[in-house]
Regions:
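Short, surface-exposed ligand- or partner-binding patches at beta-edge/loop junctions that are enriched
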Residues: 84
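Rhodanese-like catalytic fold shared by cysteine-dependent sulfurtransferases
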Residues: 1-28, 32, 39, 47-80, ...
Length: 124
């Protein structure tokens, strides 16, 4: 409940910031992931969704715990972070949340349903 309220508050707080400018399409993301090894690929879906399939090199931090766990799991606030979910709604909310938390090099990859490249299953 509290996490939901925080997400709604953050969404409203950053509604004026054009998060669409932070979008990256799958082909550009793939090119960069293949050449830049320091990019963090962040999956904000549930653990169940992650186990079913995810993009290789992904780090799972579900949206409902992102505000609480970001500082520990994503200590470098200047690192390039590509955020994705299933359809793009949670990734957009996650980008807004991370902006509020001080992260500055964010890209909204959108949904894995638009990812035409290899995915893997399992926990890691």
């Amino acid at each position: 409940m509290i996490v939901g309220v925080i997400i709604i508050w953050l969404y409203g707080k950053y509604a004026d910031k054009d998060v669409n400018k932070l979008r990256i399409d799958p082909s550009e993301a793939k090119k960069r992931l293949d050449t830049e090894k320091d990019i963090i690929l962040l999956d904000v879906r549930t653990e169940k969704e992650y186990v079913e399939n995810h993009i290789p090199r992904s780090t799972l931090i579900p949206l409902n715990v992102l505000a609480r766990e970001a500082g520990q799991k994503l200590p470098n606030k200047q690192a390039a972070i590509f955020v994705y979910c299933r359809s793009g709604n949670r990734s957009k909310a996650a980008v807004k949340m991370l902006l509020k938390l001080g992260y500055s090099n964010l890209y909204n990859l959108g949904g894995i349903i638009r990812w035409p490249y290899k995915t893997v299953s399992g926990k890691k």
